[in-house]
Design a protein with these regions (language model features):
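Conserved lysine of the Walker
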Residues: 80
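Phosphate-binding P-loop
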Residues: 59-67
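Conserved nucleotide-sensing/catalytic segment adjacent to the nucleotide-binding pocket
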Residues: 37, 98-100, 106-214
Length: 261
């Protein structure tokens, strides 16, 4: 690790105070992504950052180069994007270059198509569950299609009037759990390759950009020559299905926060 980066981290470890938040704070690279920072995000980042610094220094020493990778992960609505942006801002303020990569660029499908695939898997899995349990009848099929049309087939409330729906919902959740966060949904190999290129010292790396329509797909050549820390902000940031993350940072969220998001 270069003395310059090492010294900057050491100085910050020995004495750091949170800087002001300016209008040009770094943010993730998901097209159209916007961050809204509030007091809770700042509090989280201020708690994390002093603990992150020695971990980054140690990771760089182990990597044998002034580069390290952290991942900010957690459920929807927990503030991954905002917290990652604040950590990047704090690093830049002490003179350590940082880039925030959004893992949301790396599903195989655009959001609308992925939502449709999740729904297909959920419903097909639920129906197969009814068949396996010998709970499927023509009458229940008609009732289920009506619930699907109203988007109520996943509602726990509906099981009161349709007890067999409990079997459907459990089987549907089991089927969906095999897809969410799997290699069928996310391109983990591409992220592993990006991390590998970053750690080996590549100065420029092509990064994926994905919008919300099928044609909104392109790559952008990003300059990493002055970047020492790559922060990946992503729900699946601590997944074992890709390699190279030195420091996973898990943000806790409540069910209410997730539903609100």
């Amino acid at each position: 690790m270069t003395d310059t980066i090492s010294n900057k981290l050491t100085n910050a470890i020995e004495g750091w105070s949170a800087p002001d938040i300016g209008p040009d704070i770094p943010h993730g690279d998901m097209p159209g992504d916007k961050i809204v920072i509030n007091a809770a995000h700042i509090e989280k980042a201020r708690i994390i950052f002093p603990r992150l610094l020695p971990l980054l220094k140690n990771a760089m020493e182990q990597n044998g180069a002034p580069r390290a990778v952290a991942a900010v992960c957690g459920g929807s609505g927990v503030g991954k994007s905002e917290t990652a942006s604040l950590l990047a801002h704090y690093l830049q303020q002490i003179g350590v270059g940082c880039y925030v990569l959004s893992g949301d660029n790396y599903p195989w499908r655009i959001p609308a198509q992925n939502d449709a695939e999740r729904l297909r898997i959920y419903r097909c899995g639920g129906i197969r569950g009814l068949l396996t349990a010998n709970c499927y009848t023509a009458e229940r099929s008609a009732a289920l299609m009506e619930l699907m049309e109203k988007e109520l087939d996943a509602s726990a409330e509906q099981t009161k009037g349709h007890p067999w729906l409990t079997v459907y919902q459990q089987a549907a959740r089991d089927a969906l759990s095999g897809y969410l966060g799997s290699s069928k949904e996310q391109d983990f190999d591409q992220l592993t390759d990006i991390i590998s290129r970053f750690k080996r010292g590549d100065t420029h790396i092509w990064l994926k950009r994905m919008g919300r329509t099928p044609e909104a797909l392109w790559y952008e050549k990003v300059d990493f020559s002055q970047v020492s820390v790559l922060i990946i902000e992503w729900t699946h940031g601590n997944s074992e299905k890709y390699q190279g993350v030195d420091i996973p940072i898990l943000l806790n969220s409540t069910p209410e926060e997730t539903r609100e998001h």
